[in-house]
Amino acid sequence: MDSTNLNKRPLLQYSLSSLGSQITKWSSSRPTSPVRKARSTENDFLSKQDTSSILPSINDDGGEQWYEKFKPNCLEQVAIHKRKLKDVQEALDAMFLPNAKHRILLLSGPSGCSKSTVIKELSKILVPKYRQNSNGTSFRSTPNEHKVTEFRGDCIVNDLPQMESFSEFLKGARYLVMSNLSLILIEDLPNVFHIDTRRRFQQLILQWLYSSEPLLPPLVICITECEIPENDNNYRKFGIDYTFSAETIMNKEILMHPRLKRIKFNPINSTLLKKHLKFICVQNMKMLKEKNKWNKRQEVIDYIAQETGDIRSAITTLQFWATSSGSLPISTRESTISYFHAIGKVIHGSHSTNNDNEMINNLFENSNNLLSKEDFKLGILENYNTFNKGEFSISDASSIVDCLSECDNMNGLPESNEYGLREVRKTFRNISKQGHNHGTVYFPREWKVRKLQNSFKVQAEDWLNVSLYKYNAVHSFRNITLEFGYYAPLIRKCQSYKKKYILYYLKNLPSGSSGPKQTMDKFSDIMKVENGIDVVDRIGGPIEALSVEDGLAPLMDNDSNNCDHLEDQKKERDRRLRMLIDQYERNVMMANDDLEDEETSFNDDPIVDSDSDNSNNIGNETFGRSDEDESLCEILSQRQPRKAPVISESLSDSDLEIL
């Protein structure tokens, strides 16, 4: 056996038990220049890889997946745009400095767009650059030092729950600085679909951002964003159950924090995909020629590059085609079309095809009924002016708006959506376009209006419960909307302020004075106001304008338009209602007790005739009548009734003269 092999340390994977993470080992003998060659032919690329012996030979296949076999081993091999690579490298490089502006780098984008790959390759360059060994001496060989500490969601530490393991991971990661410097990578997130787990995850991220420690290792979070198709996906709902993105996982406080840097990734363009797929075909030239597929490689590569922007899916599809014995149809991984992507295709068209009808048909087939929803037409209305930076005639804009209006009038017909989208695409296709700048895509403001309406209804129900159970007053929803929704909380707020200074005044009165009781009686209405019960803020929130926002920013967790915030309002309404019902029942019970006390005291104190001399026989009398009165009445009843003389009621002449 060669002596060099005996002295060579085996490549093993270590895991820090206190962190619950997987440590990936990297080789230090790698080029460090991030600059990529402008162009290179297939033969030049092949000879370069053969001379450097970076990639394994095709003879030791052994059934290995190609996306693992041909994964990048240096920064130059990563499929990423030069400008995006520069942005990530500059942001990550600045995070290693002592007084770094950012503590967390958030990379978000679709699957297979080289998010985590570029971070791992950059760590090979930046971690050794900034790592400080104690006393300038390295006690371990450089190739085996950990450059990336990655959180593993399936790794349980000391039988702790998942979030406790994640918390312990972050606590231990704080010490990976100076001579132990390592880049912290979080790609495998905890179960953020569970609301309590998601909130705990957000709290831990905020603790990292607000930490008072002057020196922390760089923390990189990679989020693979996607649309989650559901049969009951309703356009009126938005949340992590339907859209897995940074906006639904994080909250607004995290995403807007000054110590967090976010970089959005796009799907890999067809040029980069073709370059890497060609290189893989060259590496497997022998096998492709044996299967008589070498001459068809370019056609297959072009098809795969147009169908997907996921490099892992593209490589897997190429491997399936190359290793199959027969000529099977090529199909890439099913990719959902996002809301903004579909809007961009309708307004700006598609680069993959010039046939607009075919493009619209593909959208209807692959969009999971997204194009049939009302929000999509509103998105077209909100963003049609972004075409060519708004430089088109007013007649074209009028025809687009008229088309969408006609589509609304035919809303009951299934063909209405197709008519509207095809007419819009036809109008834009006939407009001369300058350049390829599509501008920013905005989310329709109608979504905010609907969410604010739902929030207003919940708050109105809450105020109505207080008015009914506490003040015994009932109001219609119309009156709440027009009058009470604004003025009633304002009055209660003023009364609450008056109650505070009245209590302060009573507190400072001298003891023994009669002022407190008189003041409490005089201002009894004001003293009824309770901050935990009464609504003192305007129903629906403060009055403000609705502005358009790009992306999914208006739908974040702690935004007033989000469904999670609406659920919190419902919980607050139910909590207040339970308190009101309990208080109302206590008041009713107290009133019933007082009424029973009055009835009991009345029965114990009967009415006595003070004129009666025989007070001892009062119990034998009936309604104040004695036995003698009874006998007298019996005697009188046996006598014949007397006849009174008839008196003429008419007046004589003399009587009239006297009058």
From Swiss-Prot:
CDD domains (UniProt xref): HLD_clamp_RFC
Major localization class: nucleus
Domain of life: Eukaryota
Keyword Calcium recorded: no
InterPro entries xref list: Checkpoint_prot_Rad17_Rad24 (IPR004582), P-loop_NTPase (IPR027417), Rad17/Rad24_fun/met (IPR018324), RFC_lid (IPR047854)
Listed Acidic residues bias regions: 596-612
Annotated GO MF terms: ATP binding; chromatin binding; DNA clamp loader activity
One Gene Ontology CC term in the entry: Rad17 RFC-like complex
Places the protein is found: Nucleus
Cell cycle found in the keyword field: yes
Region of interest (Disordered), residue spans: 24-54, 596-659
Sites bearing Phosphoserine, chain numbering: 652, 654
Any single biological process term in GO: DNA repair
Segments traversing the membrane: none
Swiss-Prot/TrEMBL keywords: ATP-binding, Cell cycle, DNA damage, Nucleotide-binding, Nucleus, Phosphoprotein
Binding site for ATP: 109-116
Family, per entry: Belongs to the rad17/RAD24 family.
Assembly information from the UniProt record: Component of the RAD24-RFC complex which consists of RAD14, RFC2, RFC3, RFC4 and RFC5 and associates with the checkpoint clamp DDC1:MEC3:RAD17 complex. RAD24 interacts with ECO1.
Other notes: Present with 752 molecules/cell in log phase SD medium.
Protein task: Participates in checkpoint pathways arrest of the cell cycle, a mechanism that allows the DNA repair pathways to act to restore the integrity of the DNA prior to DNA synthesis or separation of the replicated chromosomes. Regulates the DNA damage checkpoint pathway throughout the cell cycle, when associated with RCF5. Component of the RFC-like RAD24-RFC complex which loads the checkpoint clamp DDC1:MEC3:RAD17 complex and is involved in DNA repair pathways.
Protein name: Checkpoint protein RAD24
Organism, scientific name: Saccharomyces cerevisiae (strain ATCC 204508 / S288c)
